């Protein structure tokens, strides 16, 4: 039964504490660090522990904490062809024996002694040649009770670490990010804290804390160790103090007598009316000290907690009663220099601070659980965490080995990390299946620990079956099966072609800022989190290669760079990265804003803010694998659309003629701490020269947690007399919250008229009929037939390719589905005279949609290395084609402009008409003077000859697609 703590006068008179307000004594446990050089034997033959192996003198050594990779032990990796991930320089998989002589001091006699290895792989321990036991914990610290093995004096300690495939269930070894070659690799070693510890025989084994923000109290469950059942009286004392905030708050020392009939003592500690709450905005933490005093010893332990209540209310999350929105990122343990998780608080704090600069308040750990340092850092920085079990795929209820292992791992990590305020959610793993197995796991964990919200996994059944029983929230890409060629159940805006028609909303739908996920949300009555939002590829940044100074080598980068060099485009590498990256950032913004525009939506988890170096090399981040900027978008720019407060402009399209009225609704997504009442939103419409075309204000009355419609804007655009990109800026006065939207305005007197070529310009889709005219000095605009040149062209992809081309091409071909065109957007020169009347950046933007969707870029590999199309399409790292959407040649005495987009099919769109008009006007000017000459024969070969393509090996996903 729970007790309320009260002061015990007996202890005060006994002199245990002189005043109820002073602190408890510090943790006095003695430790011996095991850091240093250890003898090393590698079972390279895979024979296992042979007789006498322990007595065999070691001929090698390794510094621990560390890994065999870091010590350059194992086999040198001679494979220079791997492109699916970064390459380990040295590889070892199997059993490694680490040995060391340790000295035990006299004062440790008669104490409880334990060995702690904070993170490792399955182990077996020997003391002086005698086997102690084994441990297979991989998500938490391994602990061995060595009290009966270590007397004062010198002892031989041997630790066998096994990272072989037989050491854990196959599903854990083969799928999870605890073992994955894609990120942290299957390392062997011991990392993090590594020590022996002495404690009183009668002491504190564990402290579990259950904060209650509403009651401003915390319940402590203290597990005691008392081998001597005849021990006399014992007293537990408690003291809590806020330690990371300017606002001081502490409790008196409070003491109760121990009931030795119960191994676990449960008490409620009231924190008082001045108690501080923990959240992303005010991450106030308390350090609770618990001291056990008996007649013979004192044992003091400490635990950190935050006073918070993270719950669901309808379809949304709440923190301490206030509605919150999860702006999350996926984490797969990407640490390229060390190839294992960081084990120190400062590294994790740095990562979280970078993420917060980009508006992130939530991390999802894909099929792995981070270490203690991560939780500590998240507590301090105010980040909401969702760790997962080390598994991805099917859980067969009849697979007792796997189910028992996952139950053990789950119980361990809840016991190890649940005190942390940042640990607010828990998922069973990634893209799971197996209803009975999942139900058994989630029901067990929910019954045993109610401090978190629970999900049966992330994107289970790829969302086709909807939410699962017992889930508190639903992380998914869809809510049930969508209607044919529709996206009505989708919970994110982009998909692979294997998983959704035409890649989903963004690639298929005419650009707008109105669409959201309301139709999917209506199908679920608990909070939805968009699973792995984004996955928009960015061309690799080869300047990053020099950063890889650790155990992982960027051989994939080097191969991709060599391929581009062989394709004659190495000089464009940086431009490819910048153009695809700028476009990728805009696509991420569109997906994020779709989430924010959805009423009563739970949040999203990006894949990703940073690159993912494995599974085919998925460069999907606006930051690199080191969480460092690629120079694509500043944190300030990103926070305009990814923050606790975001002004949104909801409009049906981005391209207008100047006789139209671009009416749009302004909404405010307010997930800050407070209401936005009594403020005003200022808006301005500016042209390309920053001249103000229109402006106004809207009064705001926006409640906390609300997605509020605050007014309709109808900015005046009639004064825009030429084709121009204008910017609608929104800002909430007196705050840092602002956002802006690009609109493209085209003059109606031109845009509404049929586009016609001037006299002397031949427009055709059949060049053969006009070759004589061309050779004799004519000007020809050629729209080659898509059907006639399928083998020499690729398809038109608006967004950048999803995740990576190799994997989803393999999956699509296996399923018999259309393969994505695989391209990464356009690269052009905005100052080129062909684009003089078509405002554009050097990269894709929304006005290119109808042009690109009707395109079929031409493969120009036969041309010389220095040839550049006017509008080039960036290819992926697997094919490396030189692709042209708009390009020109001198043919004989004539001038040929080739457009690989069926512009006639989209003449209902003003932007397509404007593009058509701009290139025709260019052909009328002296600037139309192609310098690259082709003979008629070479031109015909370009459009008819077979294209050389290299062999691409198949690559599949762990998840299966229907």
Stretches found by the model and what they are:
Residues 32, 41-45, 88-89, 93-204, ...:
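Accessory beta-strand-rich segments of carbohydrate-active enzymes
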Residues 758-806, 893, 899, 919:
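Short alpha-beta junction capping motif
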Residues 151-154, 225-313, 719-753:
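Extended acidic/polar, glycine-enriched regions
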């Amino acid at each position: 039964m729970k007790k309320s703590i009260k002061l015990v006068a007996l202890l005060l008179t006994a002199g245990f504490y002189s005043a109820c307000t002073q602190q408890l004594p510090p943790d006095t446990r003695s430790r011996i660090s095991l850091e240093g050089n250890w003898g090393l034997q590698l079972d390279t033959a895979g024979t296992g522990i042979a007789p006498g192996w322990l007595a065999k003198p070691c001929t090698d050594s390794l510094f621990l904490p560390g890994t065999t990779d870091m010590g350059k032990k194992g086999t040198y990796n001679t494979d220079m062809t791997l492109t699916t991930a970064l390459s380990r320089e040295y590889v070892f998989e199997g059993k490694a024996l680490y040995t060391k002589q340790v000295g035990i001091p006299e004062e440790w006699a008669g104490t409880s002694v334990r060995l702690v290895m904070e993170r490792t792989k399955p182990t077996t321990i020997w003391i002086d040649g005698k086997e102690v036991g084994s441990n297979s914990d991989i998500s938490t610290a391994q602990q061995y009770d060595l009290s009966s093995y270590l007397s004062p004096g010198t002892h031989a300690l041997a630790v066998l670490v096994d990272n072989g495939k037989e050491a854990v269930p196959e599903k854990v070894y083969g799928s999870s990010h605890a073992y994955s070659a894609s990120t942290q690799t299957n390392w062997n070693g011991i990392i993090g804290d590594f020590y022996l510890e002495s404690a009183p025989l009668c002491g504190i084994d564990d402290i579990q804390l259950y904060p209650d923000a509403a009651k401003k109290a915390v319940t402590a469950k203290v597990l005691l160790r008392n081998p001597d059942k005849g021990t006399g009286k014992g007293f537990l004392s408690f003291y809590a103090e806020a330690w990371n905030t300017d606002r001081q708050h502490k409790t008196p020392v409070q003491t109760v007598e121990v009931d030795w009939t119960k191994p676990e003592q449960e008490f409620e500690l009231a924190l008082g009316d001045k108690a501080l709450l923990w959240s992303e905005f005010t991450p106030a933490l308390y350090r609770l000290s618990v001291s056990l005093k008996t007649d013979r010893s004192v044992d003091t332990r400490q635990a950190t907690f935050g006073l918070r209540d993270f719950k669901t209310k309808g379809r949304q999350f709440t923190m301490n009663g206030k509605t919150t929105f999860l702006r999350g990122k996926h984490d797969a343990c990407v640490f390229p220099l060390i190839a294992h998780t960081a084990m120190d608080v400062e590294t994790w704090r740095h990562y979280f601070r970078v993420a917060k600069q980009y508006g992130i308040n939530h991390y999802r750990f894909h099929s792995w659980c981070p270490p203690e340092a991560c939780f500590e850092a998240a507590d301090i920085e105010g980040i909401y965490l969702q760790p997962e079990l080390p598994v991805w795929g099917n859980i067969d209820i009849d697979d007792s080995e796997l189910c028992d292992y996952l139950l053990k791992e789950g119980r361990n990590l809840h016991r190890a990390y649940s005190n942390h305020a940042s640990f607010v959610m828990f998922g069973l793993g990634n893209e799971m299946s197996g209803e009975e197995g999942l139900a058994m796991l989630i029901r067990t964990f929910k019954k045993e620990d109610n401090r978190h919200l629970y999900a049966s996994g992330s994107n289970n059944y790829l969302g086709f079956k909807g939410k699962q029983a017992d889930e508190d929230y639903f992380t998914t890409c869809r809510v049930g099966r969508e209607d044919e060629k529709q996206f009505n159940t989708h919970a994110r805006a982009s998909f692979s072609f294997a998983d959704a028609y035409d890649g989903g909303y963004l690639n298929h739908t005419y650009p707008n800022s109105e669409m959201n996920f309301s139709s999917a949300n209506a199908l679920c009555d608990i909070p939805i989190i968009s699973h792995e939002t984004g996955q928009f590829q960015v061309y690799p940044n080869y300047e990053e290669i020099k950063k890889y100074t650790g155990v992982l080598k960027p051989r994939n980068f080097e191969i991709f760079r060599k391929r581009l060099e062989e394709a004659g485009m190495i000089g464009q590498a940086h431009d490819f990265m910048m153009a695809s990256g700028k476009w990728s950032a805009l696509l991420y913004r569109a997906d994020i804003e779709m989430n924010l525009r959805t009423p009563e939506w739970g949040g999203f988890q990006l894949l990703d803010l940073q690159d993912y170096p494995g599974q085919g090399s998925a460069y999907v981040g606006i930051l690199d694998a080191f969480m460092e900027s690629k120079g694509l978008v500043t944190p300030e720019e990103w926070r305009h659309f990814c923050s606790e407060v975001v002004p949104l402009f909801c409009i049906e399209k981005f391209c207008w003629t100047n006789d139209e009225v671009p009416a749009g609704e302004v909404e405010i997504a307010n997930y800050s701490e407070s209401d936005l009442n009594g403020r005003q939103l200022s808006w301005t419409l500016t042209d390309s020269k920053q001249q103000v075309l229109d402006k106004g204000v809207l009064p705001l009355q926006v409640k906390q947690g609300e997605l509020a419609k605050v007014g309709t804007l109808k900015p005046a655009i009639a004064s825009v007399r030429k084709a121009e990109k204008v910017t609608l800026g929104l800002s909430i006065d007196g705050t840092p919250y602002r956002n802006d939207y690009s609109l493209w305005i085209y003059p109606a007197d031109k845009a509404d008229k049929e586009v016609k070529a001037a006299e002397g310009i031949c427009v055709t889709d059949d060049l053969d009929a006009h070759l004589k005219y061309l050779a004799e000095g004519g000007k020809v605009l050629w729209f080659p037939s898509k059907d006639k040149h399928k083998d020499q062209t690729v398809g038109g992809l608006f967004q950048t390719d999803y995740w990576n081309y190799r994997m989803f091409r393999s999956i699509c071909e296996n399923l018999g589905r259309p393969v994505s065109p695989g391209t990464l957007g356009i690269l052009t020169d905005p100052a080129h005279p062909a684009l003089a009347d078509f405002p554009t950046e050097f990269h894709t933007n929304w006005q290119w949609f109808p042009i690109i969707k009707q395109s079929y870029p031409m493969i120009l590999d036969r041309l010389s290395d220095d040839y550049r199309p006017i509008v080039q399409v960036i290819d992926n790292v697997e094919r490396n084609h030189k692709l042209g959407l708009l390009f020109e040649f001198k043919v004989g005495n004539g001038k040929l402009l080739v457009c690989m987009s069926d512009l006639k099919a989209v003449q209902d769109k003003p932007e397509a008409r404007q593009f058509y008009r701009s290139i025709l006007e260019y052909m009328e000017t002296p600037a139309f003077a192609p310098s690259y000459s082709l003979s008629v024969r070479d031109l015909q070969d370009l459009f008819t000859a077979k294209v050389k393509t290299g062999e691409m090996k198949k690559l599949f996903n762990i998840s299966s697609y229907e």
